[in-house]
């Protein structure tokens, strides 16, 4: 396999850089990582690394710290650069950087049109998935069961801002219904949130800070229902990798319906969707009282993800795209 230089976030324990790096290594790639967000001078440092290592391929996840000139310099050194953009947005700095890359990929299919109109040549749709080995664990201790066990769990930001506010309301509703609810993520801060969020009873359901890797998998395993409320459910064109992480570790995935999600999962058989709070409550009540069905859905979702939506699938597709465009073969 070719040597790959991976520019991605590694600065937080929950950063996705390690997931991408592990998948590349498991595919046999010689990977050298670079955390551009932690570097004082990322543009010069990445060029020096390319000079020293002579990588055939440079994969940039988001890459907001880079200048277009940097990718041009890497190209002159013989390194093929791929810019992988995960967001449903087109920030002002992005078009010039994407035009400088040899290949640009987007997480959401809905971004193909905006990228093309911005003058970015032949962008490709490439969804980030899950790296299963990063979530493996041997056992769940009694203390961990006490920490994570609940009827309904939610992993992510709970805040007063639009998009995240519906999570606050949903947790409050589930608590009023009498279910044992927990959520994991950054604690609600009085400095960042108005009194409405600070006084919410959902604060009492806080189960702890962000979870990642094995702790993420344990939280998913111990929650009978994993609730997901995407902040942008009407955004078409793909799912976030959070859907594949949750299903990949075997969670029973109950999500606010996101446009197009039936393209990726068989709704009702592999994951379950709802459209409003009343339907959410109805689905929670049903599946909490039908354990065998709940377990069957979780297992079917896990099998679908492991068979189709891992980062190994994503990188194999990426290598195929690159080879088809005359780039280096992995």
Which residue ranges define each predicted feature?
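Conserved acidic donor-binding segment of nucleotide-sugar-dependent glycosyltransferases
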Residues: 271-277, 287-291
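Membrane-proximal helix-turn-helix segments that form the acceptor-binding/catalytic region
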Residues: 88-102
């Amino acid at each position: 396999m070719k040597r790959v230089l991976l520019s991605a976030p590694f600065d937080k324990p929950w950063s996705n850089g390690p997931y991408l790096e592990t998948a590349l290594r498991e595919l046999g790639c010689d990977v050298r990582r670079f955390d551009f967000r932690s570097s004082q001078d990322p543009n010069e440092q990445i060029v020096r690394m390319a000079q020293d290592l002579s990588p055939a391929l440079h994969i940039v996840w988001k890459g907001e710290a880079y200048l277009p000139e940097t990718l041009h310099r890497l190209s002159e050194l013989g390194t093929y650069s791929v810019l992988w953009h995960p967001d449903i947005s087109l920030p002002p700095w992005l078009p010039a950087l994407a035009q400088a890359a040899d290949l640009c990929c987007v997480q959401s299919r809905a971004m193909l049109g905006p990228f093309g109109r911005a003058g970015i040549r032949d962008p490709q749709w490439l969804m980030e998935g899950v790296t299963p080995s990063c979530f493996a664990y041997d056992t769940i201790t009694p203390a961990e069961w006490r920490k994570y066990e609940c009827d309904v769990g939610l992993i992510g930001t709970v805040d007063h801002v639009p998009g995240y506010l519906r999570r606050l309301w949903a947790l409050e509703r589930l608590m009023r219904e009498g279910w044992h609810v927990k959520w994991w993520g950054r604690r609600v801060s009085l400095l960042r949130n108005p009194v409405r969020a600070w006084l919410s009873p959902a604060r009492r359901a806080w189960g702890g800070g962000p979870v990642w890797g094995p702790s993420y998998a344990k939280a998913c395993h111990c929650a009978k229902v994993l609730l997901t409320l995407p902040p942008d459910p009407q955004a078409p064109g793909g799912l976030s990798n959070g859907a594949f992480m949750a299903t990949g570790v075997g969670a029973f995935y109950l999500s606010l319906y996101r446009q197009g999600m039936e393209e990726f999962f068989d709704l009702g058989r592999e994951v379950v969707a709802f459209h409003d709070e009343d339907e959410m409550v109805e689905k929670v009540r049903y599946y909490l009282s039908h354990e065998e069905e709940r377990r069957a859905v979780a297992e079917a979702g896990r099998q679908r993800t492991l068979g189709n939506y891992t980062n190994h699938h994503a990188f194999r597709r990426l290598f195929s795209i690159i080879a088809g465009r005359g780039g280096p073969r992995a």
